[in-house]
Amino acid sequence: MPALTRREFLRSSSAALVYGSAFVGGTRLLASPFDLPIGLQLYSVRKLLPKDYAGTLKQVAALGYQEVEAAGYFNHSVKEVREAIDAAGLRLPSAHYSHDDLSRDFDKIIDFNKELGVSYIICSFPGIKNPARLKGHSFKTIVQSFTIDDWRWNAEEFNKMGEKVKAAGMQFGYHNHTMEFRPQHGIVPFDELLRLTDPSLVTIELDCGWVMVGGGDAVAILKRYPSRISMLHVKDFKKTRKPASVVAPPPAAVLGTGTADYQPIFEAARRANIKHYFVEQEEFDRPPMEALKIDADYMKNFKT
């Protein structure tokens, strides 16, 4: 999800499974470059799900996606979500929640996702150690205001959350944005997070697109932390004359048409511990399902 346009979502959203293959209509479907099912982060269809939850999931499956990652359940019950996922022929291995959501309703979130059969609970956006200091500030200001002390506090939070999620039979993880790669006093927050979090309690979902926008090197990260990263987000951005920044990312693009070079990233990822990957496109210049079909085909046909 984006560092800026997800504000509404962040404020309002309420044993790992490894799928080496998927079967649709008796046909074995594997996706390059990982021989893993093609996944979609459902934030991509956040405007469609509230209107027709079950129907949107069926459309997603018809595009060629086999797994989805939740970004809110839109007030549906466990039974309703499970029925919609099953009716679409999809798998739901992972769910996103902001730190604020997790802090407010952690036990309910654990219980809901455990009953649903989810394997990963992912923190989609970090917290601020002392939120009062930023009360009333814009989201843009908040994104720029994370200190090393905030990141170290988040590491402590993630370890505690990881213990509870692990005790419930699931895996806790963290999904990066852009600000984790802006050095502070010679320290890269992303590296500090991984240094201070317990590998048995906290896995990483590496958003390759946000790494690039934030000034990081996804290839180097995958090579440095091959055992810590179990999931990927795959996105692309349009070419633009304006320089990208932590708080001003370029517009989203369909995969294969923008600035991202996934060949070296996927080559490095093949040597890592990737269990799932999810396409995520957050803005569209064409009908969303048309764009997401192009994204799915890009992944299906990608060769490393």
Over which residues does each language-model region extend?
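Acidic/histidine-rich catalytic cores of soluble enzymes
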Residues: 166-259, 266
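Acidic (Asp/Glu)-rich catalytic clusters
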Residues: 32-33, 57-62, 76-92, 107-118, ...
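Conserved, mostly hydrophobic/aromatic
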Residues: 40, 60, 68, 85, ...
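Short, acidic/polar
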Residues: 48-59, 103-112, 214-221, 262
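Active-site acidic/histidine proton-transfer and metal-coordination neighborhood
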Residues: 14, 67, 91, 99-204, ...
